[in-house]
C-alpha cells in the first residue's frame, strides 16, 4: 500500500511522527506499505528547524510543494495545482491528511477528484462557528474522507449527527499522547525556566492562538483579567509576535505575565 501523508504546518508533524514510526515498523515486519511525506510549504520554512525532526525521531519531508501564500485563495489554488502534479508523479492508494488546515482540505479535494481514498486524522472536530475558517475546512474534509480517525467520543457523535457512516469512523484516541509518551524520558527542563525562577507546579502555562478570540478585544481583556484575579502564580505565555503586539495595544500587562 502506498500512503501519501500531508503536513501543512509545523504542529502537524507532532501527530504525524507516531504514524511514520508505525509505518516503518510495519514495513520492517514484512508489511507491504510505504509512506511519502509531503509538506505543502517551503524547505526554507524557518519553523522547521532540523532539531524538530530529530526530537520527533522522524524523517524530513520527501517533497516540499513550496506553496506559502498568506492569501487563502492563492494558497488554496497553489496547493490544488501542486499536489495534483505530485500525485501524477508519485501515485498513492491513500492520502492521509491531519487536522483542519487549508492544506488539509485542499489535498483532500485533489485526492478525491483523482479517485484516491482519503484518511482524516483528528476527524470530527467541531467549533460550531462557521465564521472560523477551520470549521469549514474540517467539515469539507470529513465529508470527503473514507476513513475518519477520531480523538474522542464527542468527535464520533459529531460525525454521527452529520450522517457519516459509522463503518467509516474509527476511534483511535489522541495521537499527541503517543508523541508525549515517546519523548517523555527525553524531556528536559527548559533553561528559560531557571532564568525566570519558575518552580515545579508553581506556574501556569497559557497558550493563545485563536484568531476569532484575538480579534475580540472585550473577550481578550476579560480572559486576562479573570486569570490574573484568580491566581497569584506567574504565567508563562509563549506567544506569537502578533499576539504580543495585540496585548500591548490593549494595555494588558502584569509583572506575573
Residue ranges and their predicted role:
Residues 50-53, 188-257:
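Donor-nucleotide binding loops and adjacent catalytic segments primarily
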Residues 12-16, 45-47:
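Short N-terminal binding/cap micro-motifs at the start of the first secondary-structure element
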Residues 31-75:
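Conserved nucleotide-sugar phosphate-binding/catalytic loop shared by glycosyltransferases and other
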Residues 5, 37-39, 120, 171, ...:
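Structural beta-sheet core signal
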